Amino acid sequence: ISSLFQMENRPKTLITHPALQRFLFNENAFVNRPALGILPPENFPDKLFESLLSIAPSGMSRVQTMACGSCSNENAFKSMFIWYRNKERGYASPSEQEVDTCMINQSPGCPDLSILSFMGAFHGRTMGCLAATHSKAIHKLDIPSFDWPIAPFPKLQYPLEEFVRENAQEEARCLEEVEDLIVKWRQKGRPVAGIVIEPIQAEGGDNHASPDFFSKLRNIARKHGCAFHVDEVQTGGGTTGKFWAHEHWGLDDPADVVSFSKKLLTGGYYHRDELLADKPYRIFNTWMGDPSKNLFLSEVLNVIRRENLLEEVTRSGKALLQGLYALQTQYPHILSRTRGQGTFCAIDTCNDATRDSIMLKARNKGLFMGSCGEKTIRFRPALVFKEYHVHQLLNILNDILAEHK
């Protein structure tokens, strides 16, 4: 699930880091974990600048730390709702009626706003995140949800160069549906406050779309006054060859909110100034993240820069994709739809039983792969994955596929 930055053991590198060394030998810092929302350490802002803010996405000047991907997205949704209502009120204080009705879960204090999400999405397992998740039924079953719009995510045909016209038509169809849903939900009295999307739908089957699709979707959000939330919980951290997958879109103004977790060691979300909560405690929980993780992240980022690991990912990713294409050509009755960015790659099998069999045999040979979607194998190596690792992977996979002839 793309949660590892580096898989090599680097205890000496980490433990000798001066800031981390001071932290490790300070028992008080371990035992008395600070409630960051009200009592952050004096140096906490400095540590944010050294870690999370040093890799902030384009246009993002603020970061809110959290603990995990779900609470990152859940609170990002809340930020978008608060921002939307503040706009509607003209940034005036809430009325007495709004304050009273919110206590009994009624409008106008609890407004009928919505978040637009996409089929195949996965954003988390808390209530709001589940309402925007449409890929794994087991997580949603028996849980009440919200009446929020769900748009189709493009289903691209591969190889891309052979289906340029068809894929452009498919993306146009999905974008048209997005606009129709925004208008429809506004007419229903449930206006769309925000749009949330993954740069690559991971759990849903490693589904991709073109930079043009995301650019036009960003414009639709702006046109209709919706916040645009890019969920980089799985794709962030460099595995696509860029630190943030949305950088591949080439946009100067890619998002209003970018959420993260997994590889970043801590959770949270970046946001524009205008999405800053207008009052204390509106975005709040007990811990609001963990300052120790910022120390670890700071050193991890130093290693990434020093060893040019994003360049390594680009080289290894190219070799991996080429190798998967070759296997697909050799075993067309088993494999199809090779795709990926960097080492964030995937390939489809002929059915789920075959996929599961291949993965089991691979695991028994020392190769651990993931599954997603209906019949997809996904590859999520760490950033230290080198070309010789690629060849080892491909050799093991080739041996297994030969047994399926």
What are these regions (language model features)?
Residues 1-405:
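Conserved N-terminal phosphate-binding loop of PLP-dependent enzymes in the Aspartate aminotransferase
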